């Protein structure tokens, strides 16, 4: 009897914290679940930890092949919870600075912020698009450089006037002193 109890205690102790890999995932459930393989052991469906699950929510699920930690209350793997991923040879660390927060996606997209250099970078793969919906407006403080075309569905205005006002001046302006030949005209009667 005591041997059985010691064996059971040893099994439970060994199952308190288990390292394994995600081998199955079901993201369709209200509480997404994973199956983990650790050596010859394969768990039942277990819930995975998320960053937020209250009035604010987050979604970035663990995937098949990721190395994880399973924490099992009382050493009962049926009650286990899958904690976050661990780097491994197949998926090494992508950073080497405590000042950098970096996310790299499977399609090549990279989003990184460095708090020391105060630099935010978002690089998307070729053909990617970006949508920002902010019906209250967007305010940018600082110089803006655009490489490529700018399209606007409404007028564009600077500190002097709008582009439409400039077009109106250009289309309606006149010059005095107009003569034929090589001479130039006087300045416009209405400044731009």
What are these regions (language model features)?
Residues 1-117, 188-192:
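Exposed beta-strand/loop interface patches that mediate assembly or binding
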Residues 7, 108, 162, 173-178:
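Generic signature of intrinsically disordered, low-complexity segments enriched in small/polar residues
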Residues 36, 51, 77, 81, ...:
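Generic detector of intrinsically disordered, low-complexity, polar/charged segments
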């Amino acid at each position: 009897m005591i041997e059985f109890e010691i064996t059971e205690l040893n099994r439970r102790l060994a199952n308190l914290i288990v390292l394994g890999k995600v081998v199955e995932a079901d993201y369709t459930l209200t509480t997404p679940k994973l199956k983990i393989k650790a050596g010859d052991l394969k768990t039942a469906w277990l819930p995975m930890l998320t960053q937020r699950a209250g009035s604010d929510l987050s979604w970035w699920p663990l995937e098949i092949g990721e190395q994880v930690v399973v924490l099992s209350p009382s050493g009962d793997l049926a009650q286990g919870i899958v904690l976050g991923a661990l780097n491994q040879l197949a998926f090494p660390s992508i950073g080497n600075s405590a000042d950098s927060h970096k996310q790299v996606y499977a399609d090549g997209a990279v989003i990184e912020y460095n708090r020391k250099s105060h630099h935010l970078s978002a690089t998307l793969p070729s053909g990617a698009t970006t949508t920002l919906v902010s019906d209250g407006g967007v305010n940018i403080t600082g110089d803006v450089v655009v490489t490529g075309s700018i399209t606007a569905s409404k007028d564009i205005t600077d500190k002097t006037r709008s582009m439409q006002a400039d077009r109106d001046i250009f289309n309606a302006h006149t010059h005095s002193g107009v003569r034929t030949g090589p001479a130039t005209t006087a300045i416009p009667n209405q400044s731009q």
